[in-house]
């Protein structure tokens, strides 16, 4: 059985960005691992870190990340994920990024999280030996996404097995956003028809109850927003229906492309 490892900076990124591809591979008999990097609960948060939960109506005494991990567990159950892994590392607001604007600046010189990410994920990669790795492009340049993208080569992920997904909803809000400049330069689009999986993707996204208000304007807006976005993505590549558009190197194994696109 083939294995796909979906690498998510935060507890929602894979669902929002490539949940349709996840559902498609699962329906085709693949084993799916969902690995999220920044998932740690930090006791008694203050300042901007605390504001990230109180501005969503969550009281200061509540363990915000525990709520989010429960949402991730709900998504994994719905999508029949085989392996759900949390790397238990702190999000950027707990690493000195003290404002919303700071989240979208280049990594700080004193932010040494990359080494910790490699330490947590390298053994997992060796254990799972995934046939396919899906990782973010870092559209929007959120520092946590950038850190994940830039450490990927240290995990031994080969170009022939990596697909980079379009970080959503950044791709919705910033359609001209470019991938992180450290990605390989010879990437080509892989257009995955997710028309049949779109409804399931939408339901999966609504599992992230603490996030859909901020990211989409409410649970009721998730479906229309994603339907319109994925229709535009398909049309931009001369297709009908709804598509998630990934990037792959020229050396992508043809069998992997066929599993995703039937081409």
Please place each PLM-identified region on the residue numbering.
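Active-site beta-strand->loop->alpha-helix modules in alpha/beta enzyme cores, enriched
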Residues: 2-158
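The feature marks non-catalytic terminal segments
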Residues: 70-89, 97-103, 123, 127, ...
